[in-house]
């Protein structure tokens, strides 16, 4: 069941700009209390930018679009919460589970609710050991079939970025750089992977979104927004940490859904919190840019 908060429903119906937010960053992406503070601060960024935030999560089997502060607090602290991807939504509903929604599940809920723009930190993608594990995130399949706009700082740096970009190409997903001509690399802004298309204003992007909708192309538009320059980390240092984290994951036999949370936690601890600080900064930055895009989209409808 999908339940839209009254203030979010009113915003959608009156053509106010709305920005969706995921909740696995709360349940599995950051430690407490950084997860709670970040979730509330990101919502505040969107409000101050003139848009309406709609954090999405699952509580007792109900897909909630527009979590209350009390519900966000619950997801930030509760134990045994599930990481809920698109394929898990029906099970979560049937078994009355609670948990954070991944990019794919949040995209689905956003689209069903009528929200056009979704901001996240980084998407999932092709894992570096995919040749052996076949570990490819459902996020990529969702991007290839759900027509909303996703603002991110690229794919998480722990992934195989060239393979992820190639997979998106295969799925026919338009990747647009926002004030960049390279696919962002999450912790460090420049991956060296050139993008075919880029824009410099929210208005340009809004026009592309409108044309996509007019043509009825049922695929997402992925907006690559680099982390703030002052918060971007040095590539060599990050890559060393990632290699060590991947080795530790193998030693600990970490697999499937547990891989990404394990790696992010390892990086945060072994970078003395630097990766966590960058993660927080880029999520806020993406929320701000998402708000500008949502406002540009709605401006043409009023």
Swiss-Prot record:
Keywords from the named record: Glycosidase, Hydrolase, Lyase, Manganese, Metal-binding
Cofactor detail note: Binds 1 Mn(2+) ion per subunit.
EC number annotated for this UniProt entry: 4.2.1.70
One cellular-component annotation, GO: cytoplasm
EC category name: lyase
Pfam families: Indigoidine_A
GO MF, one example: hydrolase activity, acting on glycosyl bonds
Binding of substrate, residues: 83, 103, 137-139
Cofactor(s) required, per the database record: Mn(2+)
Gene Ontology BP term (one): nucleobase catabolic process
Presence of the UniProt keyword Cell wall biogenesis/degradation in the record: no
Stated role: Catalyzes the reversible cleavage of pseudouridine 5'-phosphate (PsiMP) to ribose 5-phosphate and uracil. Functions biologically in the cleavage direction, as part of a pseudouridine degradation pathway.
Quaternary structure and interacting proteins, as annotated: Homotrimer.
UniProt record similarity statement: Belongs to the pseudouridine-5'-phosphate glycosidase family.
Matching PANTHER family: CARBOHYDRATE KINASE PFKB DOMAIN-CONTAINING PROTEIN (PTHR42909:SF1), ZGC:136858 (PTHR42909)
Protein name: Pseudouridine-5'-phosphate glycosidase
Species assigned in the record: Coprothermobacter proteolyticus (strain ATCC 35245 / DSM 5265 / OCM 4 / BT)
């Amino acid at each position: 069941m999908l339940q839209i908060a009254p203030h979010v429903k009113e915003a959608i119906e009156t053509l106010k700009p709305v920005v969706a937010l995921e909740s696995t960053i709360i349940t599995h992406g950051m430690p407490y209390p950084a997860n709670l503070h970040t979730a509330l601060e990101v919502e505040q960024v969107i409000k101050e930018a003139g848009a309406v935030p709609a954090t999405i999560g699952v509580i007792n089997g109900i897909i909630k679009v527009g979590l209350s502060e009390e519900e966000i607090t619950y997801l930030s602290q509760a134990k045994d919460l599930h990481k809920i991807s698109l394929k898990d939504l029906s099970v979560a509903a049937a078994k009355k589970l609670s948990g954070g929604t991944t990019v794919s599940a949040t995209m689905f809920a956003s689209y069903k609710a009528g929200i056009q723009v979704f901001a996240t930190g980084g998407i999932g993608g092709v894992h570096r050991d995919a040749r052996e594990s076949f570990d490819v995130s459902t996020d990529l399949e969702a991007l290839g079939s759900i027509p909303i706009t996703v603002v991110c700082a690229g794919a998480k740096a722990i992934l195989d970025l060239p393979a992820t970009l190639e997979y998106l190409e295969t799925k026919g997903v338009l990747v647009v750089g926002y004030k960049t001509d390279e696919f962002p690399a999450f912790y460090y802004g420049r991956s060296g992977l050139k993008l075919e298309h880029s824009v410099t204003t929210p208005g340009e992007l809004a026009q592309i979104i409108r044309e996509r909708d007019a043509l009825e192309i049922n695929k997402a538009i992925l907006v690559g927004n680099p982390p703030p320059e002052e918060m971007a980390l040095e590539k060599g240092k990050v890559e060393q940490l990632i290699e060590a984290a991947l080795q530790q994951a193998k030693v600990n036999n970490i697999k499937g859904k547990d891989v990404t949370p394990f790696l992010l936690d390892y990086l945060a601890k072994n970078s003395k919190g630097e990766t966590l600080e960058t993660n927080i900064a880029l999520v806020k930055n993406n929320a701000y840019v998402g708000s500008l895009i949502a406002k540009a989209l709605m401006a043409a409808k009023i």
